[in-house]
A protein has these predicted regions:
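Contiguous beta-strand segments within globular domains
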Residues: 42-61, 66-72, 103-115, 177-194
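Acidic, serine/threonine- and proline-rich intrinsically disordered appendage/tail regions
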Residues: 150-213
Length: 213
């Protein structure tokens, strides 16, 4: 009887310790689902700055959640690579990325990434691409690689992308288990660029903004 009581007490202690660790001590990881859609092309408006857009669910494996400090993408093609480090996110209301709390349930939203101001353009030429998504977590020195996505643009698609206002969509096809491409001309309204610039300048939500994907 005494041994049974001791075993129950030890088991209860282990369960309590595990619960404490999972709830308060375990820092967990930041993860993301495979993006359902990825876009390469102009951001809309007169300047036509290169942009990468994707939609995904970002979530934390820890119960206490994680604070995401920054998110950016790196696009590689052969020996060429370019960081798209200006991060804007949201559905109808766009906000400049400047910290976001991510819980276990995650946040599914649109993410827009633009090149730095000192980059005049980026040629989405034909070739095989690798799109890496990185997240910087508050309190951790290293950035985390959240996803690495393989994409391809053929010669015919690259030629179309050189036309003004044209972009390429990569839509995930679950049956084919690969991304399917679609070229579209994007006729953005003159206000789109202004709204995006206001969001980048103020670092706050623009309540009148519309999706720029």
């Amino acid at each position: 009887m005494a041994m049974a009581s001791l075993a129950i007490s030890v088991l209860a202690f282990i369960v309590s310790a595990a619960t404490l660790w999972l709830s308060h001590l375990y820092r967990g990881k930041l993860q993301m689902t495979r993006p359902t859609v990825v876009f390469f092309g102009p951001d809309g408006g007169a300047s036509g700055n290169p942009k990468i857009y994707l939609r995904t669910l970002i979530y934390a494996t820890a119960r206490r959640g994680i604070v995401l400090e920054n998110l950016y993408v790196r696009l590689r093609r052969g020996e060429t690579q370019q960081n798209f480090n200006i991060w804007v996110y949201g559905e109808r209301d766009l906000a400049r990325g400047s910290g976001l709390f991510i819980g276990q349930e995650g946040i599914a939203t649109n993410h827009h990434f633009l090149t730095p101001n000192d980059v005049n353009g980026f040629d989405f030429a034909a070739g095989e691409y690798k799109l890496d998504v990185f997240g910087k977590i508050v309190g951790r020195n290293r950035v985390s690689l959240l996803s690495s996505i393989d994409l391809k643009i053929d010669a015919q698609e690259a030629e179309k992308l050189r036309q003004p206002d044209h972009g390429i969509y990569f839509d995930w096809g679950p049956d084919a288990a690969r991304y399917q491409t679609k070229i579209e001309a994007r006729r953005a309204s003159p206000m789109d660029q202004l709204k995006l610039l206001e969001t980048l300048r103020d670092g706050a939500t623009d309540p009148t903004a519309q999706p720029i994907s």
